[in-house]
């Protein structure tokens, strides 16, 4: 398959994720859209690494996935705390984290 197709797919996935973050108010859906955006960037990194014959893009994608896994743990813990206290996963209820 042509590497340009992977880049088009990456751009499409990033656009879908960005529109989901901007248009949705549910924290879990927004969280999934951010993860979709990260995976789109990882696909672009791996595609560019494959095109140029280097492993740098693949290493960056690997470390991005490691950081994303840590982000999932912390993010879901915060979302579950908000859901337990407010009985809603709306980002409008996130003001309870203010000091």
Swiss-Prot record:
Q: Output the PANTHER family linked to this UniProt entry.
A: NADH DEHYDROGENASE SUBUNIT 4L-RELATED (PTHR11434:SF21), NADH-UBIQUINONE OXIDOREDUCTASE SUBUNIT ND4L (PTHR11434)
Q: Name one GO cellular component term.
A: NADH dehydrogenase complex
Q: What class of enzyme is it?
A: translocase
What exactly does this protein do? NDH-1 shuttles electrons from NADH, via FMN and iron-sulfur (Fe-S) centers, to quinones in the respiratory chain. The immediate electron acceptor for the enzyme in this species is believed to be a menaquinone. Couples the redox reaction to proton translocation (for every two electrons transferred, four hydrogen ions are translocated across the cytoplasmic membrane), and thus conserves the redox energy in a proton gradient.
| Sorted UniProt keywords | Cell membrane, Membrane, NAD, Quinone, Translocase, Transmembrane, Transmembrane helix, Transport
UniProt name for this protein: NADH-quinone oxidoreductase subunit K
Transmembrane as a keyword?
yes
One GO biological process this protein is involved in is: ATP synthesis coupled electron transport
Assembly behavior = NDH-1 is composed of 14 different subunits. Subunits NuoA, H, J, K, L, M, N constitute the membrane sector of the complex.
Per UniProt, what is the membrane topology?
Multi-pass membrane protein
User: Subcellular location, in the record's words?
Assistant: Cell membrane
One Pfam entry name: Oxidored_q2
Native organism: Mycobacterium marinum (strain ATCC BAA-535 / M)
What is this enzyme's EC?
7.1.1.-
Give me the reactions it catalyses: a quinone + NADH + 5 H(+)(in) = a quinol + NAD(+) + 4 H(+)(out)
Where does this protein chiefly localize?
membrane
Q: Which InterPro entries match?
A: NADH_UbQ_OxRdtase_chain4L/K (IPR001133), NUOK/Mnh_C1-like (IPR039428)
List the Gene Ontology MF annotations in alphabetical order.
NADH:ubiquinone reductase (non-electrogenic) activity; quinone binding
Family named by the database record: Belongs to the complex I subunit 4L family.
Q: Which residues cross the membrane?
A: 3-23, 28-48, 59-79
